[in-house]
């Protein structure tokens, strides 16, 4: 991306202020409204002396006004500190108090939640809305209090966003992501999925559907990518099949993005193929995509499903498929997340001594972006001789059962192969005798029946004895993170509650 992110966003906002920008709940917000909110946020931060890379908390709901606030902080050169609105009041207030930001922005409804103004701790409080367009001070928080507040990021490489990880294996962590990281990731995605190179600054005719939470990397990145490319967005509060199908049917996009669990939900809902007549490609990331789900979706809807691999630490995508790769390699490389994107390098190293592994050998995945150094991930994988990356699990979720190492991913893959199983999750629980034991929870497909005993018997035929879960339960819905990954802390809580 040759143009700095903030300059690019400012240029897009000024192209045609009256043109539609974001559809939300069947109503369009124009670029002028986004620019007005963004400009007012920028002005108010500067007015109270927060002009040097301010850290600004955003209770980041999927809402056009919060997109405007997000743009305002970035235009001011600040750091967006993401705060998850899906927490209960106690958790939300603890999160707000913990980040100690000098400014906090939210929708009016979130400011009305119990004790949120108190948790802000004297920060400048701003509430934003679109009906009418507004950016107002919160009563009692109209000026900067004494703090103490966190210091601004003064890194040589300015920080754009402190992003929450998905919290799949433990409590979410905050990852600082620089403006440069977003610029590189947007450029890499544009080059990988488009044949026309870096897009010019202009408004486009298509509509991109964003159904992932803005508080998660997938939703935030897709929003910034599409705005920087001048593309309209249809924004969902959360993914629901009927609302998603309505948007696809009305806007006829060529490409859509669905996480693996959303692909399965569309299949389960028996959505007719006609709904996807305009769609050529479906990108899918954030979690492993079972090959059987990919094959079933492609067969039913006649689309190319393009798995991808990314991480919060890299501000989005690292590797992926595109349509050209799919046409040539899809049948031979099932299970792969594609090849590294432009400006990304991937290598596999030994978990024990860090030496680089040969093609086809499993190890820890390391990534290097343009101008950077090698960064170790917690993911296990391998790269074949043709440069395709395969993800095999994580290095930090192994269960040690009496000295035997058990991968939750192996249990989940086996359970997903049962015809009655829609999805599954596995984690480890403490055990006095063995140290840890694996347990599993299963969500059944619509109309299917299977008992825990039947599923355990199914696993005994497919796994080693020490891999078979000590306990298995069937649940109506698996606990999930905001990005719809199965949550291991949530699984542990299920079993702890059942035991109590």
Tell where the protein language model's regions lie, with residue ranges.
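Conserved AMP-binding/adenylate-forming core of the ANL superfamily
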Residues: 2, 20-49, 54-63, 67, ...
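Conserved AMP-binding/adenylation subdomain of ANL enzymes
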Residues: 183-207, 215-254
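Structural core segment of the AMP-binding/adenylate-forming
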Residues: 47-48, 71, 75-142
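Gly/Ser/Thr-rich phosphate-binding loop
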Residues: 228, 254-257, 268-332, 345
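Conserved pre-ATP/AMP-binding loop-to-beta segment of ANL
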Residues: 145-164, 170-171, 198-207
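Conserved AMP-binding A3 loop
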Residues: 30-32, 160-187
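Conserved structural elements of the adenylate-forming
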Residues: 35-40, 175-200, 211, 263-268
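AMP-binding/adenylate-forming catalytic core of the ANL superfamily
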Residues: 378-467, 477, 486, 490-493
């Amino acid at each position: 991306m040759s143009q700095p992110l903030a300059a690019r966003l400012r240029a897009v906002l000024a192209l045609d202020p009256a043109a539609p920008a974001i559809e939300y709940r069947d109503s369009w917000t124009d670029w002028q409204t986004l620019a007005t909110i963004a400009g007012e946020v920028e002005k108010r931060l500067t007015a109270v002396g927060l002009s040097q890379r301010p850290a600004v908390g955003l209770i980041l709901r999927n809402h056009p006004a919060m997109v405007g606030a997000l743009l305002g902080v970035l235009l001011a050169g600040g750091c967006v500190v993401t705060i998850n609105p899906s927490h209960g009041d106690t958790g939300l207030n603890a999160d707000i108090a913990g980040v100690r930001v000098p400014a906090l922005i939210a929708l009016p409804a979130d400011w009305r939640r119990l004790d949120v103004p108190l948790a802000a701790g004297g920060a400048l409080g701003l509430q934003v809305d679109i009906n009418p367009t507004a950016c107002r001070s919160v009563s009692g928080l109209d000026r900067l209090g004494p703090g103490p507040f966190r210091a601004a990021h003064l890194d040589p490489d300015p920080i754009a966003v402190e992003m929450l990880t998905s919290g799949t294996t433990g409590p979410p962590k905050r990852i600082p992501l620089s403006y440069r990281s977003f610029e590189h990731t947007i450029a890499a995605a544009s080059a990988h999925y488009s044949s026309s190179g870096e897009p010019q600054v202009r408004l486009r005719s298509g509509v991109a559907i964003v159904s992932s939470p803005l508080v998660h990397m997938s939703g935030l990145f897709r929003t910034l990518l599409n705005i920087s490319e001048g593309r309209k967005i249809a924004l969902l509060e959360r993914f629901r099949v009927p609302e998603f199908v309505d948007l696809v049917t009305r806007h006829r996009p060529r490409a859509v993005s669905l996480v693996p669990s959303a692909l399965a939900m569309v299949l389960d809902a028996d959505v007719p193929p006609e709904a996807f007549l305009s769609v050529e490609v479906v990108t899918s990331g954030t979690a492993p995509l079972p090959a059987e789900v990919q094959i079933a979706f492609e067969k039913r809807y006649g689309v190319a499903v393009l798995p991808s691999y990314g991480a919060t630490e890299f501000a989005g995508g690292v590797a992926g498929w595109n349509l050209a790769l799919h046409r040539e390699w899809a049948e031979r490389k099932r299970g792969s997340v594609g090849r590294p994107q432009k400006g990304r390098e991937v290598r596999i190293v030994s978990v024990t001594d860090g030496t680089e592994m040969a093609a086809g050998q499993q190890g820890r995945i390391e990534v290097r972006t343009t101008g950077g150094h090698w960064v170790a991930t917690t993911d296990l994988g391998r790269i074949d001789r043709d440069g395709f990356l395969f993800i095999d699990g994580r290095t930090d979720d192994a269960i040690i059962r009496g000295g035997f190492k058990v991968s939750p991913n192996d249990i989940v893959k086996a359970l997903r192969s049962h015809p009655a199983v829609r999805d599954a999750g596995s984690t480890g629980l403490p055990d006095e005798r063995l140290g840890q034991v694996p347990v599993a929870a299963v969500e059944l497909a619509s109309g299917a029946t299977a008992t825990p005993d039947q599923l355990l018997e199914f696993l005994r035929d497919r796994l080693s004895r020490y891999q078979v879960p000590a306990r298995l339960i069937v649940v109506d819905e698996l606990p999930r993170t905001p990005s719809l990954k199965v949550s291991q802390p949530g699984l542990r809580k299920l079993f702890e509650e059942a035991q109590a």
